[in-house]
Amino acid sequence: MKVSVPATSANLGPGFDCLGLAVSLKNQVIIRPSKFHSVSLKGEGANNPALKDNNMFISIFNDFYQNLSHKKRFFRFEFQNEIPLSRGLGSSSAVIVSAIASAYAIEGIKLERDKLLNLALAYESHPDNITPAVMGGFNVACVQENEVKYINKPIPKSLKAVIVVPNRAISTAMSRKTLPFKYSKEDTIFNISHSSLLTAAFMSENWEMLKYASNDQVHQKYRMKQMPELFEVQKTALKEGALMSTLSGSGSTLFSMAYTDDSRNLEKALKNKFPHFRVFVVDFDNTGVKIEL
């Protein structure tokens, strides 16, 4: 059995804790019955032995599998990770979603996506991360009475994600501590209006509106101060043809969107100016979690 989950870019522009989308960097796990427990890990995080010894996927998988099956079995877990760790691309959400989906699939129990989404909420309280991981595409999401309420919109093939991944992380916990305890009425209105406009731009596919709608006063400028070169990355991306350029999650990755025809020039400009950072040009993912038995 094989399960894959896409990377996500959440806190999209002004959409703090409510807007997110999925891109086609994926984490994949193959699970096989075995006589004893074993783990192999390739790709991102392969050089970190702690991920084998203290694996969040296996912990969540075992909890669900034992509750569903009421028996103990051994498995071989083969991980192939494309999502950079601790860089604001939803690697934790991918682990949570894939672990729960795998436990149900191994037992042959059909799991509706909405139920999977709400089971994942117990481990990840921010719906802008887990919703695109499950559903793919662009998502507007909130939590109401312990359930995720969302609207999903596929993203056309004519657009690409251009992702700049710095060589160091920004801690999510530390990143949240940089945010103000209170916001002014002006900044609050700014973000409500801009997140509304950003949502409308995605839903109507008015891509030229993104450069205005993606502005933010609530979180990006505070978080990006921890890595000031991100301001220059953002400025360069917008100058070189990006439709929008925003911090991904809590950072340190910077996410940009561009027309397919412009994406390679944008990639080249970013690689030339920031050779110590990784730059990916990838499709958007409209599938979300995928299970192959």
Curated annotation (Swiss-Prot):
Molecular function via GO: ATP binding; homoserine kinase activity
Enzyme class: transferase
InterPro entries: GHMP_kinase_C_dom, GHMP_kinase_C_sf, GHMP_kinase_N_dom, GHMP_knse_ATP-bd_CS, Homoserine_kinase, Ribosomal_Su5_D2-typ_SF, Ribsml_uS5_D2-typ_fold_subgr
Pathways involved: Amino-acid biosynthesis; L-threonine biosynthesis; L-threonine from L-aspartate: step 4/5
GO cellular component labels: cytoplasm
Binding site for ATP: 84-94
UniProt-annotated location(s): Cytoplasm
Domain of life: Bacteria
GO biological process terms, semicolon-separated: threonine biosynthetic process
Enzyme nomenclature, EC number: 2.7.1.39
Entry keyword set: Amino-acid biosynthesis, ATP-binding, Cytoplasm, Kinase, Nucleotide-binding, Threonine biosynthesis, Transferase
Residue ranges of coiled coil: none
Family membership noted in the UniProt record: Belongs to the GHMP kinase family. Homoserine kinase subfamily.
PANTHER family, A to Z: HOMOSERINE KINASE, HOMOSERINE/4-DIPHOSPHOCYTIDYL-2-C-METHYL-D-ERYTHRITOL KINASE
NCBIfam families: thrB
Function: Catalyzes the ATP-dependent phosphorylation of L-homoserine to L-homoserine phosphate.
Name the UniProt record assigns to this protein: Homoserine kinase
Source organism: Aliarcobacter butzleri (strain RM4018)
Gene this protein is translated from: thrB
